[in-house]
């Protein structure tokens, strides 16, 4: 079954109920939320989530396991001097996600900030992930493929697989972002060759969430600028291949394409992507 949705607002007064209603209004059957502003660590009490209302009204239409939580951008688990804060915050974030019954939390792997070689930053990330897993249960942390902007780590599949192998726990997996891997240099427009690459290198089985975005920039730009579907360099034909690929059935595919305060593309984009 295709699971297709988008990032939706998790905000007062209705929080979870409002987010899932927005998703259903867009024709989605999955969703992604931030449990607070993505730029900071401010969080409300779980008692304000309207979780019981969600259970009563919407849980039969979008199950908790089909709601993805995205960790905030400020968390850098690959920086040793900031890792204690990152671990403590992410443990609490996983616990908040557990309250809802979330299955997947997406995490940006971090930056080395020119403080360490890439390999050392990856090992710092491994250490942090192990500490988080020791203090949490159930939820799987999905490391997002990055565009390689600045000192971002994990802009290639090899590095993400290295981290996952070193952690050696089924609760660490991958979130594939189409804009990011395009900007990192992967030619996903040659979809069959790209898919073969994923299979041949044992990357396909690691993917548990997909962020489906077009890119404002050409391949290998390392810019990380999302575009609306078919309005960038990747184009609709390629992005539809991800949606209709049987290997990605039952994996939440999440749109993070640009929207404004007064306009959302998601209803139209979901309809367009689902069309055969």
From Swiss-Prot:
One of its GO terms (molecular function) is DNA-(apurinic or apyrimidinic site) endonuclease activity. GO terms for biological process: base-excision repair. PROSITE patterns: AP_NUCLEASE_F2_2, AP_NUCLEASE_F2_3, AP_NUCLEASE_F2_4. Its cofactor is Zn(2+). Its EC number is 3.1.21.2. Belongs to the AP endonuclease 2 family. NCBIfam families: nfo, PRK01060.1-1. This is Probable endonuclease 4.
């Amino acid at each position: 079954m295709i699971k297709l949705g988008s990032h939706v607002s998790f905000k007062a007064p209705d929080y979870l109920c409002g987010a899932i209603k927005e998703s259903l209004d867009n024709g989605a059957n999955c969703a992604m939320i931030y449990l607070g502003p993505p730029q900071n660590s401010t969080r409300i009490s779980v008692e304000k989530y309207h979780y019981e209302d969600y259970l009563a009204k919407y849980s039969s239409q979008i199950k908790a396991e089909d709601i993805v939580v995205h960790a905030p951008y400020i968390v850098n688990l690959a920086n040793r001097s900031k890792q204690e804060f990152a671990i403590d915050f992410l443990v609490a974030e996983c616990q908040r996600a557990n309250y809802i019954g979330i299955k997947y939390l997406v995490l940006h792997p971090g930056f080395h900030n020119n403080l360490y070689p890439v390999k050392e930053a990856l090992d710092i990330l491994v250490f942090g992930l192990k500490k988080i897993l020791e203090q949490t249960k159930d939820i799987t942390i999905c490391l997002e493929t990055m565009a390689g902007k600045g000192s971002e780590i994990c802009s290639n599949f090899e590095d993400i697989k290295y981290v996952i192998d070193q952690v050696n726990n089924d609760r660490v997996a991958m979130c594939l972002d189409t804009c990011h891997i395009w900007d990192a240099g992967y030619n996903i427009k040659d979809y069959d060759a790209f898919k073969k690459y994923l299979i041949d290198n044992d990357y396909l089985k690691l993917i548990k969430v997909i962020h489906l975005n077009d890119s404002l920039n050409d391949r290998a730009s390392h810019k990380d600028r999302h575009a609306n579907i078919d309005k960038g360099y990747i184009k609709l034909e390629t992005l539809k291949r991800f949606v209709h690929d049987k290997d990605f059935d039952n994996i939440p595919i999440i749109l993070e394409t640009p929207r404004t305060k007064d306009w959302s593309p998601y209803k139209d984009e979901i309809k367009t992507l689902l069309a055969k």
